[in-house]
Amino acid sequence: MKKIMACLVIMAALIGCSKSDDQGGGLSTPENTLPKKNDDHGGKTLPKGVFPKKIAHKTENGNISYEITNNVQGEKILSTTSISYKRDGSIESKILISFSYEGDYPKEATYKRSKTNGENENYTETYSFVDGKLKNTTLKHDTNPRATKTTTYSYHNDGKLAKVLVEEPRKSSLNGQIMEDIYVTETDYTHTGNVITATEKRYFKDTQGNKRDENTSLTTYTYTFENENLIKVTESTTEYYSTTEYTYDEKNNPLFQNFKKLMDPDYFNDAKNSKNNILTRKTTDKYNYNSSTIVNEHVYEYTYADNNYPLTQKIFRKRTENGVEKKELGETTEYAY
């Protein structure tokens, strides 16, 4: 399931118009709406020359872990195929995602996943838009219609994201008994200048909608932006505090798309969706139970096409050994446009 959703996220991130304004401060692009017919996009859904037709991800030893191929006709993507590989190079699974549209807006996506061991999974996700903004999505499992995941978005009066509510039926154990309930993730957003604060609550409620307060977990995030790039993220719970800082190049990020913002209103919480490409990432985790601190640093290297879009991305982990700084290759991504 995680691989299926990851495939959709990557695919959705790549669809759409790539225009952005070179304004300073926080998020200065249009707020999660498709381009109008009279703007300089000409109402087109897909850009020309910057849309990756194929993306290949490779492990540290150069073997392909998975690759995505997109079927684009005219100004819309009709389908995308994702193939996952085992370590020995053989195919582990295939996912075919097909899209239908209502005008310029996606209406439905169907997922068909097949594994070499004979297991198959089918999903359907529908989208609902109100006043040009995504209002809700519904993900249904064809083999289990009860397991329907819904996501509802609400917005402040200025059009900025206010809340994301995710509800997913699950089975859990209570007092030694297996019971059906609903797992809820509720995230509230506030916007102050170039900082967005998110308060995330996770809890269970029964099928009648009664909340179980004893299972509530609370996490607070802050996102700081500069020139449409996410430069700092903090995450805080009762158990730990984490800070991640990013730096960027001045080139074009193929994942920075208006359509991504339309289909994923909380796109901004992932640095991979920033305007430019990540150069460095430093994460510092502090744990309360033993007062320990763990620091991880990564460096990104690219080759670029003539239009300043990346052809390859390599991610290295930085470490120091006997006073000497070293880099270890973690993964490589290759883009074909």
Residues covered by each model-derived region:
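Buried hydrophobic residues that stabilize the cores of well-folded domains
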Residues: 20-337
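Sec-dependent signal peptide hydrophobic core
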Residues: 5-9
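C-terminal motif of bacterial Sec signal peptides marking the signal peptidase cleavage site
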Residues: 14-16
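Positively charged n-region of N-terminal signal peptides that target proteins for export
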Residues: 1-4, 18
